[in-house]
A protein has these predicted regions:
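A shared catalytic/ligand-binding motif for oxyanion handling
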Residues: 1-186
């Protein structure tokens, strides 16, 4: 990750290293930004960003694919967001889809387990910011001929007051990656 930080010319970073082929989170930023670490564990990095007009919380989240660990990871995310009073954005690999249109070439429906992503959007009245390129961010197999594709990675936000009208970003652009089953987000 140090090579990426240096190559992209960012001066600062917070990193949760990946384990095997799972996990891994990173926030990079340049000097001059006021960023304060709020929470840091294997499933999330949360930082408070102080702007000249307001503060907001950025959460980078890795929703583990392992069923036995999902409840704990999502519980930490929900607790963090419940304790925060103000605008926030959450970006990451949620390892859930919202509906059947977010997957291709695979069996539709049949999900009996709790969909924590749907609960997050509902409980916090969050907004999924959408996408501007290929909606699928994960593929089983090579990207060009993948048997299954899904939209597992996304950005969700809660805006309060005037921030919604002043700071609403454009849809997230997600370029395809040739070396990982996930696409980087920017």
């Amino acid at each position: 990750m140090e090579y990426v930080r240096s190559y992209l010319k960012f001066e600062n970073k917070l990193v949760v290293e990946f384990k095997g082929s799972a996990g891994g989170l990173c926030i990079l930023w340049k000097n001059g930004m006021s960023i304060k670490e709020v929470e840091f564990d294997k499933n999330l990095i949360a930082v408070k960003i102080v702007d000249s007009t307001f503060n907001w919380l950025l959460v980078c989240f890795y929703g583990t694919p392992y069923h036995s660990k999902k409840k704990k990871a999502w519980g930490s995310l929900f607790a963090l967001l419940e304790a925060h009073h103000g605008p926030w954005a959450c970006i990451g690999d949620f390892n859930f889809i919202i509906n059947d249109e977010e997957k291709s070439r695979s069996k539709k429906g049949g999900a009996l387990a709790t969909n924590f992503l749907k609960e997050l959007l509902f409980e916090f009245n969050a907004v999924d910011l959408g996408y501007s390129r290929d909606k699928f961010t994960w593929a089983k197999g090579k990207w060009g001929s993948a048997v299954i594709k899904r939209r597992m990675d996304r950005v969700s936000q809660v805006f309060l007051g005037d921030w919604l009208t002043q700071k609403l970003p454009s849809p997230i652009s997600i370029p395809l990656s040739q070396t990982t089953p996930h696409s980087p987000q920017h």
